[in-house]
Amino acid sequence: MKTAIIQLPGLNRDQDMLVALHHITGVEPIKIWQTESTIPDVDVIVIPGGFSYGDYLRCGAIGARTPVLQAVREKAQKGVTVIGICNGFQILLEARLLPGALMRNTSLKFVCREIKLEVVNANTRFSRYYSKGQIIRCPVAHHDGNYFVDNETLKQMEDNEQIVFRYAENTNPNGSIRDIAGIINKAGNILGMMPHPENFIEPAHSGTDGRLLFQSALELTNG
């Protein structure tokens, strides 16, 4: 299985993602720099977390307007699987590849801790190896993770089952509407989420709850 990791100035979780994907697939991901206007044939494209371009203007605003993001858009339109984690999620929202926006945490503080997620929709290419209602552990590390969307769009998302993960058991770290932690687009091939599943893929690193997300996306057997 071939994977690609998008690299932008200020993204600092690319190495974490590379280690995770390499560990799961046995194949080292391709790194795609910001100035690239094409992306080779791959099965999954990942935009990792960090602080692209120093979060100037808005988190993800500059990153969403780079040549490589246009290439990501073109691949996504062809049905290629795309995952945006944390700042990657912010970039996907700024690029209008996903609905809604991410605002400053209601605490006005950077939040870095382990939280619990509820699997809301287990019938997606990202969650098929989980069970609906399953509670999983995952870390968060962000300052602007407060997801917001207007009521009309929220209803459409709920009707379309686009909400994949929610913060569970009063663990919402940022004030996100309806405790939303991860969503997909209508076509179901783009996932954006604030938590970092790439950090929970080995038992020695606090657990393996994040591993199934990548195995699901890559259609790898659960094992």
UniProtKB/Swiss-Prot annotation:
Record-annotated Glutamine amidotransferase type-1 domain positions: 2-223
Coiled coil, from the record: none
An example molecular function term from Gene Ontology annotations: glutaminase activity
First-listed, main subcellular location of the protein, grouped into a coarse class: cytoplasm
Compartments, record wording: Cytoplasm
Keyword Nucleotide-binding attributed: yes
Pathway listed: Purine metabolism; IMP biosynthesis via de novo pathway; 5-amino-1-(5-phospho-D-ribosyl)imidazole from N(2)-formyl-N(1)-(5-phospho-D-ribosyl)glycinamide: step 1/2
UniProt keywords, alphabetically: ATP-binding, Cytoplasm, Glutamine amidotransferase, Hydrolase, Ligase, Nucleotide-binding, Purine biosynthesis
Entry's EC annotation: 6.3.5.3, 3.5.1.2
GO cellular component, one term: cytoplasm
Catalytically driven reaction(s): N(2)-formyl-N(1)-(5-phospho-beta-D-ribosyl)glycinamide + L-glutamine + ATP + H2O = 2-formamido-N(1)-(5-O-phospho-beta-D-ribosyl)acetamidine + L-glutamate + ADP + phosphate + H(+); L-glutamine + H2O = L-glutamate + NH4(+)
Pfam families the UniProt entry points to: GATase_5
Keyword Hydrolase: yes
Active site: 86, 196, 198
Biological process terms in GO annotation: 'de novo' IMP biosynthetic process
PROSITE patterns: GATASE_TYPE_1 (PS51273)
NCBIfam families in the record: FGAM_synth_I, PRK03619.1
Assembly behavior: Part of the FGAM synthase complex composed of 1 PurL, 1 PurQ and 2 PurS subunits.
Role this protein plays: Part of the phosphoribosylformylglycinamidine synthase complex involved in the purines biosynthetic pathway. Catalyzes the ATP-dependent conversion of formylglycinamide ribonucleotide (FGAR) and glutamine to yield formylglycinamidine ribonucleotide (FGAM) and glutamate. The FGAM synthase complex is composed of three subunits. PurQ produces an ammonia molecule by converting glutamine to glutamate. PurL transfers the ammonia molecule to FGAR to form FGAM in an ATP-dependent manner.
Protein name: Phosphoribosylformylglycinamidine synthase subunit PurQ
Organism: Bartonella quintana (strain Toulouse)
